[in-house]
Amino acid sequence: MSELASQQCEACRADAPKVSEQELNELMRLIPDWQPLVVKGELQLRREFTFRNFKEALAFTNRLGELAEAEFHHPAILTEWGKVTVSWWTHKIGGLHRNDFIMAARTDELLK
């Protein structure tokens, strides 16, 4: 398990700080397959995972759903034939919190 994936998520409040530009740059180095992007004015992390068929994509989606429920932090998930697109951000703060990077790293671990 990566160092980032092994970290604990913290309960997030509406007044929690978003990651700074410096933190963003540091954390992105730990999850190089993810892309930061702005959607409807909110910074998010996005990654597309590819699979051989829909069954594998759906199985990954279900594992990710279990992970999200365990942490009570939920991504946007688009499951299609042969691919799953995952977006992490913290709805309460309208952007990225350290938890999103931890969950992105844990999402990567689901492939191992």
From Swiss-Prot:
Provide the top EC class: lyase
Q: Which InterPro entries does the protein's record reference? A: PCD_sf, Pterin-4-alpha-carb_dehyd, Pterin_deHydtase
CDD domains attached here?
PCD_DCoH_subfamily_a
What biological processes does GO assign it?
tetrahydrobiopterin biosynthetic process
Q: Which GO terms describe its molecular function?
A: 4-alpha-hydroxytetrahydrobiopterin dehydratase activity
Which Gene3D superfamilies does the record cross-reference, listed alphabetically?
Transcriptional coactivator/pterin dehydratase
Catalytically driven reaction(s)? (4aS,6R)-4a-hydroxy-L-erythro-5,6,7,8-tetrahydrobiopterin = (6R)-L-erythro-6,7-dihydrobiopterin + H2O
Similarity field: Belongs to the pterin-4-alpha-carbinolamine dehydratase family.
Instruction: Tell me what this protein is called.
Output: Putative pterin-4-alpha-carbinolamine dehydratase
Q: Which organism is it from?
A: Aeromonas hydrophila subsp. hydrophila (strain ATCC 7966 / DSM 30187 / BCRC 13018 / CCUG 14551 / JCM 1027 / KCTC 2358 / NCIMB 9240 / NCTC 8049)
